[in-house]
């Protein structure tokens, strides 16, 4: 018969008992624990004082009979009640379904008291096997090769999430949420979840599944702490703590608004006007841009608007730059009024151009031909005569009268008649009388 001797291990923090078997025989009716404290070694006494709670060791019959030395077997010890993380108000590893989080302070153990206001998504029926994209997180970082083997055994949902996707950086400030959400949306797209994210028009290709909803909620919660979210995001999550899709929809809408703001600023900085379009159209275009920026809480002062408009003026409107260069109090309405005035003046001048061309055509040269000459002779006349000039017919009559009185005193000429008159040159007439002798 073999005997047992109980030794307390001073290095065990929870009083684990080890049973060792020796070859020395003891009477079978002796209780191995019925040993006085004086007979114990000194180090065993100290161990007995320190360890107030001891676990019962198995009886003599529980030790197998073996004449050889048996290796000590540690007894089961309950884990400590107070660990490193408190379990109240935290996600358990079985509830976390995130990707590659072990390197980001183990978000499965992060506090999320602001989000967990309802057990709708994280306390399912225990008989319902919740499929996961990846295995639950552990306290140690998994080996990359082992993690790939584990991923292959996990049942996949409708959309297969890509492994080894780089997570987004943690959200750090309320002002940078619009920038952070771009990285978060890119992270979801790289995880093959881009078809459940709303596009620029707010439309989605399909409805997300329960597992995808939980996956998006976990990732958003882990990397965007509640106290760092903007006010409008907090208002949405206070109504429905898991409505991350609405947050994404409004974020995309705000992105489009920001893009429109950028386009409006570019259009306002590149304004050009030379009078090719009406002044009213130009005023409406500029006013629409300024009003749209004002609706987005961006106020454009009159001075800034006038400076941008003056920079783009050209042609007849360019002189307004010098006029407004020394002005300190610029009014946008006054600038539009002066642009309208110059446009109207140019329009009136353009309407008068055809009548001026018609008056100028009256001064053009007019040709006239002589019918009685063999060779056509072209004469040039001006229709606008002076008051001192006389008609050509009156000149011819005066010349004929004077020649008649000169022939009366001539005795050799009995009768004379003018048979024909020819135009010899441009300024005077020549008479060729024909005389008949009896």
Curated annotation (Swiss-Prot):
One of the protein's GO biological processes: viral translational frameshifting
Region (Disordered): 1-88, 365-397, 419-438
Keywords tagged on the record: Cytoplasm, RNA-binding, Transposable element
One function term, GO molecular function aspect: RNA binding
Residues of the site described as Cleavage: 397-398
A cellular component annotation (GO) from this entry: cytoplasm
Pfam families noted in UniProt: TYA
Superkingdom to which the source organism belongs: Eukaryota
Chief place where the protein resides: cytoplasm
Keyword RNA-binding annotated: yes
Annotated spans, RNA-binding: 295-397
Matches recorded under InterPro entries: TYA
Start-end of Low complexity biased regions: 369-381
Residue ranges with Polar residues bias: 19-39, 49-60
Subcellular location: Cytoplasm
Remaining remarks: Retrotransposons are mobile genetic entities that are able to replicate via an RNA intermediate and a reverse transcription step. In contrast to retroviruses, retrotransposons are non-infectious, lack an envelope and remain intracellular. Ty2 retrotransposons belong to the copia elements (pseudoviridae).
Domain comment in the entry: The C-terminal RNA-binding region of CA is sufficient for all its nucleocapsid-like chaperone activities.
Subunit structure, as described in the record: Homotrimer.
Role summary: Capsid protein (CA) is the structural component of the virus-like particle (VLP), forming the shell that encapsulates the retrotransposons dimeric RNA genome. The particles are assembled from trimer-clustered units and there are holes in the capsid shells that allow for the diffusion of macromolecules. CA also has nucleocapsid-like chaperone activity, promoting primer tRNA(i)-Met annealing to the multipartite primer-binding site (PBS), dimerization of Ty2 RNA and initiation of reverse transcription.
Protein name: Transposon Ty2-OR2 Gag polyprotein
UniProt organism field: Saccharomyces cerevisiae (strain ATCC 204508 / S288c)
Gene name for this UniProt entry: TY2A-OR2
């Amino acid at each position: 018969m073999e005997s047992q001797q109980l030794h307390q291990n001073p290095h065990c923090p929870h009083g684990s008992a080890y049973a060792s078997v020796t070859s020395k025989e003891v009477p079978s009716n002796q209780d191995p624990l019925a040993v006085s404290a004086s007979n114990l070694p000194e180090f065993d006494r100290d161990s007995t004082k320190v360890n107030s709670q001891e676990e019962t060791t198995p009886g003599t019959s529980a030790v197998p009979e073996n004449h050889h030395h048996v290796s000590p077997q540690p007894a089961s010890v309950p884990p400590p009640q107070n660990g490193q993380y408190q379990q109240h108000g935290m996600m358990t590893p079985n509830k976390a379904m995130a990707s590659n989080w072990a390197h980001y302070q183990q978000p499965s153990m992060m506090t999320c008291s602001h989000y967990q206001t309802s057990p709708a998504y994280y306390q399912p029926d225990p008989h319902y096997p919740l499929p996961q994209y990846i295995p639950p997180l552990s306290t140690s970082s998994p080996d990359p090769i082992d993690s790939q083997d584990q991923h292959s055994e996990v049942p996949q949902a409708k959309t297969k999430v890509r492994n080894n996707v780089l997570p987004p950086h943690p959200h750090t400030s309320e002002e940078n949420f619009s920038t952070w959400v771009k990285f978060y949306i890119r992270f979801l797209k790289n995880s093959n979840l881009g078809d459940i994210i709303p596009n620029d028009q707010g439309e989605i290709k399909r409805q997300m599944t329960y597992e995808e909803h939980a996956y998006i909620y976990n990732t958003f919660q882990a990397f965007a702490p509640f106290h760092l979210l903007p006010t409008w995001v907090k208002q949405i999550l206070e109504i429905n703590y898991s409505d991350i899709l609405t947050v994404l929809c409004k974020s995309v809408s705000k992105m489009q608004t920001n893009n429109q703001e950028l386009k409006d600023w570019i259009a306002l900085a590149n304004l050009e006007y030379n009078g090719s379009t009406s002044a009213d159209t130009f005023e409406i275009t500029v006013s629409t841009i300024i009003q749209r920026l004002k609706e987005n809480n961006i106020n454009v002062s009159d001075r800034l608007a006038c400076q941008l408009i003056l920079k783009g003026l050209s042609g007849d409107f360019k002189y307004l730059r010098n006029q407004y260069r020394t002005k300190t109090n610029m009014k946008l309405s006054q600038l539009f009024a002066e642009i309208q005035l110059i446009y109207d003046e140019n329009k009136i001048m353009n309407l008068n151009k055809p009548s001026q061309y018609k008056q100028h055509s009256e001064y053009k040269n007019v040709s006239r031909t002589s019918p009685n000459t063999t060779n056509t002779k072209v004469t040039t006349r001006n229709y606008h005569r002076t008051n001192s000039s006389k008609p050509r017919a009156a000149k011819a009559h005066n010349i004929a009268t004077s020649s008649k009185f000169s022939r009366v005193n001539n005795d050799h000429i009995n009768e004379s008649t003018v048979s024909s008159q020819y135009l010899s040159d441009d300024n005077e007439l020549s008479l060729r009388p024909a005389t008949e002798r009896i």
